[in-house]
Amino acid sequence: SISSSPILLAKAGILDDRKFCAGLYEEVIDKYEFIPRKNLVRKPIYEDRNLITALGFAYREFAISVARKVGIQCSNEEFKGIIKEDYKDEELIFHTNMDYKEL
């Protein structure tokens, strides 16, 4: 599940006992009690058992992880570009525009 789509997994209860990352605004996470903040990790991509979640900008890393999970041999060089390994937490926290009042 990539970008904001983990919200659907949360609504279905799938994330209740799994760690995950998601491209969701902090305000959205606060608004919806079904999103288990305690399981949210600040990583661009995260794998917990058979579930892979990623932020939208980590689509390359997500594709490589999914390919490997289904048994396709895939090197880190399979796709062009640079993989950034270390992110600061503040780089992975998103807020809505303050001019937008209603979620």
Regions found by a protein language model. Name each.
Residues 4-103:
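Active-site-adjacent pocket-lining segments in enzyme domains
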